């Protein structure tokens, strides 16, 4: 089964342009499904993937308390896999065509207040004052994620040539291999120049290639390491929610809208394919307005 999963992984990467994060999640979902099938029928193969089995697997996941968003992703993983397997001749028919996608409950994303974002950035800047290469890199990670709102996978995928420091622009390769240009401000530029001048040269090795961000051993930075950096930096801010890079992306979008940015401009900056995804952030700003109103207005 692993050889089939390897071929499916190649399909996701080369033909569908899925990120490393999505591919890992999909393969993990499918391994969970295959383990479920083997528990029911030892030695089960792809022919064991029937609609009742798929429904039973999802029902077991739901009974175990799996979140709706995760169930929706697992359903998507299965539907993508079985459709691919039929096209490859690995399955005679697609059992997932009638498998319904659980409706994910749309919840407001956790975001930082502007003062909390400022405190997190100040903490990252303070840690970089001694010139330690990793501290300079960590400062750049936090500054650039908040300044641009790009995804952590997009940040870690940047090469040096993707950065126009003088014009303060990033050339970002997003989902579906769609390229967009994203601006950043002076604080992020300062963090970038410090990293390129003093941080990156100290970590670079023959294996670094053109990668902008590097790990401690000189290789391209893994998004999981960047997530750890963000969690630790934001976690040091009193009262701040526990967020990672995606939370900084949410925060950047929310603060742009609070500052009066046009919704379609924010959509372009974030690389959303539809405006509906970006509109979720308008609910965050409305929720904040209502909270302030309820607290401050005498007739609330």
UniProtKB/Swiss-Prot annotation:
Subcellular location: Cytoplasm
GO cellular component, one term: cytoplasm
Biological role: Site-specific tyrosine recombinase, which acts by catalyzing the cutting and rejoining of the recombining DNA molecules. The XerC-XerD complex is essential to convert dimers of the bacterial chromosome into monomers to permit their segregation at cell division. It also contributes to the segregational stability of plasmids.
Family statement drawn from the similarity comment of this UniProt entry: Belongs to the 'phage' integrase family. XerC subfamily.
Matching NCBIfam families: PRK00283.1
Superkingdom assignment: Bacteria
Listed PROSITE patterns: CB, TYR_RECOMBINASE
Residue positions of the active site: 151, 175, 246, 249, 272, 281
Protein name per its UniProtKB record: Tyrosine recombinase XerC
One Pfam short name: Phage_int_SAM_1
Domain called Tyr recombinase: residue spans: 107-294
One of the GO biological process terms: chromosome segregation
Molecular function GO terms recorded: DNA binding; tyrosine-based site-specific recombinase activity
The keyword Cytoplasm is assigned to this record: yes
Natural source organism: Mycobacterium sp. (strain KMS)
């Amino acid at each position: 089964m692993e050889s089939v999963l390897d071929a499916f992984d190649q399909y996701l990467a080369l033909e569908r342009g899925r990120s490393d994060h999505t591919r890992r999640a999909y393969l993990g979902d499918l391994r969970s499904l295959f383990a479920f099938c083997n528990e029911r029928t030892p030695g089960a193969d792809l022919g064991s993937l029937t609609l009742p089995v798929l429904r039973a697997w999802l029902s077991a996941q739901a009974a175990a308390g799996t979140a709706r968003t995760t169930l929706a992703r697992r359903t998507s993983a299965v539907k993508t896999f079985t459709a691919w397997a039929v096209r490859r001749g690995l399955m005679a028919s697609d059992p997932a065509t009638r498998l319904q996608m659980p409706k994910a409950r749309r919840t407001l994303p956790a975001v930082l207040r502007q003062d909390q974002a400022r405190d997190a950035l100040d903490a990252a800047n303070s840690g970089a004052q001694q010139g330690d290469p990793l501290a300079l890199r960590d400062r750049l990670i936090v500054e650039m994620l908040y300044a641009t709102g790009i995804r952590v996978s997009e940040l870690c995928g940047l090469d040096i040539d993707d950065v126009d420091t003088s014009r303060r622009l990033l050339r970002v390769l997003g989902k579906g291999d769609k390229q967009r240009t994203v601006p950043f401000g002076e604080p992020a530029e300062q963090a970038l120049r410090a990293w390129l001048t003093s941080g990156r040269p100290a970590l670079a090795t023959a294996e670094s290639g053109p990668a902008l961000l590097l790990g401690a051993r000189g290789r391209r930075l893994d998004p999981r390491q960047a997530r750890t950096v963000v969690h630790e930096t934001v976690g040091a801010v009193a009262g701040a929610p526990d967020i990672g890079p995606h939370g900084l992306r949410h925060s950047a979008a929310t603060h742009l809208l609070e500052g009066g940015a046009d919704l379609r401009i924010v959509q372009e900056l974030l690389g959303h394919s539809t405006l509906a995804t970006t509109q979720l952030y308008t609910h965050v700003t409305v929720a904040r307005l209502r909270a302030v109103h309820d607290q401050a207005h005498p007739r609330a």
